[in-house]
């Protein structure tokens, strides 16, 4: 059923190796930073792999009072862009660890 002698042991060894690689990848992802932009780069938000905001950069041209609402919208859009980018990066990195192995629908990695 498991490929003969030692098949189950080999399967368990492979599962442990994958678990170790996934843990290492999760740590790497948590430490990485991704920057999202909006307004053609007027607002930039940098977040970590755990979605914590590290830095917000605002072009000085947006610092006028009548630009407040637009600035707020641009910050939200930049954060959403950074969040989308980090999720894409996480999926790519985890796919490299799982070797393209299909995960069950709705399965979320523990991070």
Curated annotation (Swiss-Prot):
Family: Belongs to the YbaB/EbfC family.
Phylogenetic classification of the source organism: Bacteria, Pseudomonadati, Pseudomonadota, Gammaproteobacteria, Vibrionales
Family matches, as Gene3D superfamilies: Nucleoid-associated protein YbaB-like domain
Disordered: annotated segments: 1-23, 89-111
This protein's record includes keyword Acetylation: no
Organism: Aliivibrio fischeri (strain ATCC 700601 / ES114) (Vibrio fischeri)
Location, primary (coarse class): cytoplasm
Entry function: Binds to DNA and alters its conformation. May be involved in regulation of gene expression, nucleoid organization and DNA protection.
Domain of life where this protein originates: Bacteria
GO molecular function, one term: DNA binding
Disulfide links within the chain: none
Cellular component terms (Gene Ontology): bacterial nucleoid; cytosol
Cellular localisation: Cytoplasm, Nucleoid
Subunit structure: Homodimer.
The entry's keywords: Cytoplasm, DNA-binding
PANTHER family reported in the protein's UniProt record: NUCLEOID-ASSOCIATED PROTEIN YBAB
Protein name listed in UniProt: Nucleoid-associated protein VF_1686
């Amino acid at each position: 059923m498991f490929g003969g002698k030692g098949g189950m042991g080999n399967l368990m060894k492979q599962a442990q190796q994958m678990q170790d690689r996934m843990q290492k990848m999760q740590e790497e992802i948590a430490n990485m930073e991704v920057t999202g932009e909006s307004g053609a780069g007027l607002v930039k938000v940098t977040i970590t792999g755990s979605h914590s905001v590290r830095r917000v950069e605002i072009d000085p041209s947006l610092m006028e009072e009548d630009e407040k609402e637009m600035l707020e919208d641009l910050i939200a859009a930049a954060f959403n862009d950074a969040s989308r980018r980090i999720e894409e990066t996480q999926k790519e990195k985890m796919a490299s660890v799982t070797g393209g192995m299909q995960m069950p629908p709705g399965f979320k990695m523990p991070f």
